[in-house]
Structures are given as structure tokens and as C-alpha cells.
Amino acid sequence: SSLRQVSPNTTTAQAVVGAGAHLIEVYGQLAAAQMLIPAGSCPTVGITGLALGGGIGVLGRAYGMTSDNIDSLQMVTADGVLRTCSPNQHEDLYWASRGGGGGNFGIVTSFTFKTHPIPAINLFTLEWAWGDAGAVLESWMQWLPNTPKELWSNCQLDSNGSAGGGGVVKVTGVFAGPTAACSSALAPLLSAAGSTPSYQFVGPEDYFRAMTIEGGCEGESVSQCDAVTRSAFVAKSSYINAALSGAGVSSIIDAISSLATTVPSVGGGIVFDGYGGVINDVAADATAFVHRAAVACAQYSVTYGSGNPPDSIAAGVTAWLNETQTRFAPYATGSYQNYIDPTLPNWAEAYYGSNLPRLSQIKRKWDSDDYFHFAQSIPLSA
């Protein structure tokens, strides 16, 4: 349908994307035209929810949030009128739609995105013994803000599920540039971490194949990737604006050990997604996406496999997530609006921060009857 259509325009370096398109469809169609937009990893995620709430991805430090690449959008507002929102038409809706979250101001039917030429792509994976996890996390958080914007990385701490409380620590990422420059950018991390990785890979990859690797459907076609099924999981998130060290790092490592003892039969962990680069070059009030000073966004999650877990396990999982949120509390500066969290206290402030009053003002102007309403929609007054 036209709602899933992706139409690249190499002359204007733009792409018109229907609101129903999935990320893997966008990546596939644009790659065929040697173009990209920065967006998320999960192949079956819809472009609209992702873009309206920000959109972090593996090329975000190089090209910005997905929302930063919206040149204009078409939206049906609560009065039933289809409107074009851009820097010079309905500028308030355009501002609110770049980070203000989905389902708040109207029904988006299409986006026009700014696109970028596909660069050389390199992938990297580094793994260390669990005993090095604290040193690796601390080194990673201090290293990342000083890396080139072409580099994106995450740091993953995963429970191995054993009552002994061990786990897996790895740093993975994508570099939009030559292999030699990627290796050079990684050198300070390897030096700072202090110990040699147990596994190390750095190498070039085709752009579209790299997107399938990051999306968990390596080497598959668009239609195959679009059929990927996901395990059931529950998660929370915290933005971190300053590198953790000492007690903060120890507390996070302890959280992984705690998961294995609290609910030993489930998988889970904490992943720190890197921010910075051009994401943080944008002022916090330039768009509705306020999180412009973060070193990383931490997502802590537990995977169930499929279906709902027994109550006994669910209780343990909830307890661990809440305990981990408490561990992050001294360092947290909000939560990611696209990782919507039904149990988050003060969610509106956590998602939107200092932009909340303006978002509420725009909500009152365009949807005074609160027609577009859900449990965590933008409130009419803030």
C-alpha cells in the first residue's frame, strides 16, 4: 500500500516514506538507491513510532536521531484536516513531531526525510572475561565521548543465568568510515580497559548486510527480516549524562549478579547505547527531543522467551527491574520516550524534561479535547 511506500529522490537527497513502512523496508529501498537515514536496529519496527519519539540507531552519532532527519511530514490533526508540517508550515507541530512521541498530536501519513550517501561501513565486536566487566564499562563510558562522530558503540552486560552471578561483557559497534580509522578509534579503549579481549573482530561490511546483522537477521532478504519474531521481554531505561565510575560501576555490575540470583531461569542484562556526536550538537529545545547531553541510554531488560511467565518469576523480574532503576537513580537524567514504561513515576518529565510545557501548549492548541489520548499521552497542562 502507499502507506508502506518508500520513494527515494537522488536529485533532492530526500526520501518520502509512508507512515506504515517498517525499518527493514526503508533500509532496503534506500540502500538500492545508495542512500540511508539513521534509524533503529529492529527490522520490524515501524518508522512512524520510531521517528516521532526520537529514534536512536547505529548511525546516530554520525547523522543524528531519526527525528533530526525529518524535513517535513503530513499529519491529519484532530479536526480531520491533512496538514503539511515543516520549518515554515505549522512549525509548532513540526517541532513537536520530532521527539514528542507518537499518538499525541495527530495521525501521520508520510514523512519526507533528508538522506545521506552510504559510507564505508565497519563493524566491531570486543569481548572480555566477566572479571573485567567493571573496568570495561568504566573505560567505555570515558572513551566514547571522545571518539569520532562516525563511531557508534554500545556496551552490553548480560547475565549468564548462573547462581554464581557471572555474565558476559562486550562492546560492539558500527563505524561509518575506513577500517584503519575504526581500529585507530578503538585503540584508546583497548588500552584503557587494561586487559586483552577474549574475542576481537574489526572489519568491513556491506551497508545493508550490516543493518541485517544489527537487526538479528544476518544476510536475509527484506521480506525474511520483516518476518523475524521477537522474544517477549520487559524493560526500563535511564539516560546517563556523565561517565559512571567507582561505586556507580560496581553497583551496575552487582545488578547483573543480582539478576542471576533473583530469577536464575531467565535471560537479561543491561545495554548502554552510545549517544554524543551530532546528536548532542543539537540544542535541547531545538526539537521536542530533549536528551541532548547523554553519554548513553541504559536499557535494562529481562527476556521471557514466549508468552507470560509464571507469577513467581514475574514478581522476581519486577523486583529486579525496580532495584536496578534505583541503582541508576543517582545518575539518571530521564528516560527514552520510545521505551515507553507503564510503571515509570513522573514519566512526562522523564521523557520530555524542559520541553514538556511547550508540548502541552501545542497539545492544547491542536487537540484541546484530548482526542488523541492514551495512558502516557502528552497532558493538556504541565
Task: Name what the model sees in each region.
Residues 1-382:
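Soluble FAD-dependent oxygen oxidases
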